Amino acid sequence: MVEGHIRRRCATSDQQSATIELERGGSFTIALRPDKAAKTVANFVAKATSGFYEGKTFHRVEDWVVQGGDPEGTGRGGGKMPSELNDLPFTKGAAGIARGPDIKVNNEAQWFVCKADASWLNNQYTNLGQVTSGQDVVNGIRIGDKIKKITVG
C-alpha cells in the first residue's frame, strides 16, 4: 500500500518545463502545471514545440508583468479557447494566459509572467505554471524583446 502510494506520487510529480530563450540572450524556465490546466498547457506546449513562438515579441512590459506570444505583436492577436481557472496563485514568477473581457475565454496564443505578486488575477486568469529559474531575466525583459526558442522537457 505504501509502495503504491509512493509510486503514484512520483508518477504525478513528473512535471514538464518550458525554457524560454531570448534573442538578446538569457533564458528562464517555467514549471508547467498540466494537473491544473491540462488543455492550456497542452496548447502552450504544442505552440512552443512547433516553433510558433519563435521571433514573437514581448509587446507588454509593466512593473508587475511581461506579456508576449501575440502573432500580431500588438496585444490583439491570437485565437480563443476556454479558460481553465484554478487555485494556483499569481505570485511573482507565475505564468498565465491572457484573455479578453469574458472570463470564460482565454487567448490561445498570448501568455504572461508576473514580475511581482498579482493576487487580483487569482481565479480570474488561467495559471499554467511557475518560473523556477531566470526570474532576473524576466524582470529585465523590455518591450520588443523577441523569443528565440522555447524548449519543452
Question: Which residues does each PLM region occupy?
Answer:
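Cyclophilin-like peptidyl-prolyl cis-trans isomerases
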Residues: M1-G153
